[in-house]
Structure formats: structure tokens, C-alpha cells
Amino acid sequence: MAGLEVLFASAAPSMSCPQDALVCFLHWEVVTNGYYALGTGDQPGPSDKKSELLPAKWNSNKELYALRYESKDGARKLLLKAVSVENGMIINVLELGTQQVADLTLNLDDYIDAEDLSDFHRTYKNSEELRSQIRSGIITPIHEQWEKARANSPPREFPPATAREVDPLQISSHRPHTSRQPAWRDPLSPFAVGGDDLDPFGCQRGGMIVDPLRSGFPRVLIDPSSGLPNRLPPGAVPPGARFDPFGPIGTSPSGPNPDHLPPPGYDDMYL
């Protein structure tokens, strides 16, 4: 039982009853199983600190001992209370995170010799049995219940995306892949007209529809609005688009010439 005698020596000057000796042994067993003492009372205090020794004023109340512990990995916190009842003690331990409880009742006469509390070798008797009682009644149940609660806990949920991460008004930087129109290459020869119809895979050569702007002959500026009473809005005819003129090429957009006299023989059906 390494460490118990050293702990007893540090606490012996303040021991005055069998209950003190039993709580000292209980504290040693809890620390041996991977805990630090934090302080006394139900609530944390400004004087709390992690230590393997008993905290100050740990036995100021002989009727009710209240000690708080924290596991070395910080995962579990215990609240231990020992209540004096006639010639025995009722020990209750609460795991603060899961609210799991374990309790144990011990008879003082079975484990403590009250005749000389200053002598370590005479104070405790049946030490192995006492240690087994504490482990099976408190330490093991608390650990098993904590592990079970941890295994049954729901998986961690990630918070939803913030407004900064998802903005419906923000233009996405990822543009969908769209098919692009093949670049129009001017034929180098007027005889290239219709070449695309001979190639089933299409090599971007001219088809049977002749574009007057891309026929290979000297180009003549054509007004797309020819034959219309008003001009087309900008962008109505994309550059390089194939189209049929709306009217005779070269007419004025203001309309035909105002002829006041009918043409000769307009009323002769046999003419």
C-alpha cells in the first residue's frame, strides 16, 4: 500500500476519531485510482488546487465529510460525502458529469482501531478487505457507469454553416462547366463552302448556308435593319450570326420613295 503511510503521517496530527482515519484511507484509495483532491464542500472555492494530500479543513465537520476530486485527465469529477451513523459510516460518491451515484456502508470497528490513532501500524486492520470494499462499492461502479454513459451519448453534432459561409446573394466562384461554341474560322477560299456537309464529324468548315459576311469574298457592310421601319436594338443580331435580311439590302430605314403617280399599265391585267 505505497503512499498510505506517508499520507497518514501528514494527516495524523489532525486526527481525533475513527471517522478521520477511515476518511484518510478512503482518500488514499481514490487518489490511487487516478484522482486529485480539489477541496472541501459541495461547490468549488478560491482555495481549490489539485493535490494528492487531504485539503485543508478536511475534517472540520465530524458528522459530514465532503471532498471533491478530479481525474488526472480532467474527464471526471467526483463529490464524495461520508456521513457518521452510530458506529459506522455511509459513503456516497456522485460523478458530477453523468450524475451517477455509488454508495457504501462500512462498520468502523471492522477496520479501525481507535485506541491509538497516532500509530499507523495499529490504526488500520483488515486493510486489504477495506480496500476491496471501497473498490467494488465505489470506484468500479462509478467508472463502469461513466463508461456506459459515454458510450450511449449521442455523436457530436457540428453547428450549421453560418451566414458568412452560405450567402445566397454571393456570386459563387465555382462556375459550371458549359459547352462553348467553336470559334468561327473564316474560310481561306470560297470553295470551302459546303465542306462541313462532307465531314460527318464537323471540322468547323463552311456549310451550304452561305454567310454573306464570311463567304471569303470582299465584304460589303450590311445593315441588319434593312427593310424595317426602325433600327434593331444593339445586340439583336450577334456578331457573325447567319441571318436573312428583313428587306431589300440598301433601302432606307425611313421607307420607300414616295412615288405620287402609279406605274404605267398598273391596271392592265394582261400586261
Swiss-Prot record:
Gene3D superfamilies, per database record: 3.40.1000.30
Modified residues (Omega-N-methylarginine): 205, 231
Sites of Asymmetric dimethylarginine modification: 219
UniProt region (Disordered), positions on chain: 226-271
Span list, region Important for homodimerization and interaction with FBXO7: 2-150
Family: Belongs to the proteasome inhibitor PI31 family.
Protein name: Proteasome inhibitor PI31 subunit
Organism this protein belongs to: Mus musculus (Mouse)
Taxon lineage: Eukaryota, Metazoa, Chordata, Craniata, Vertebrata
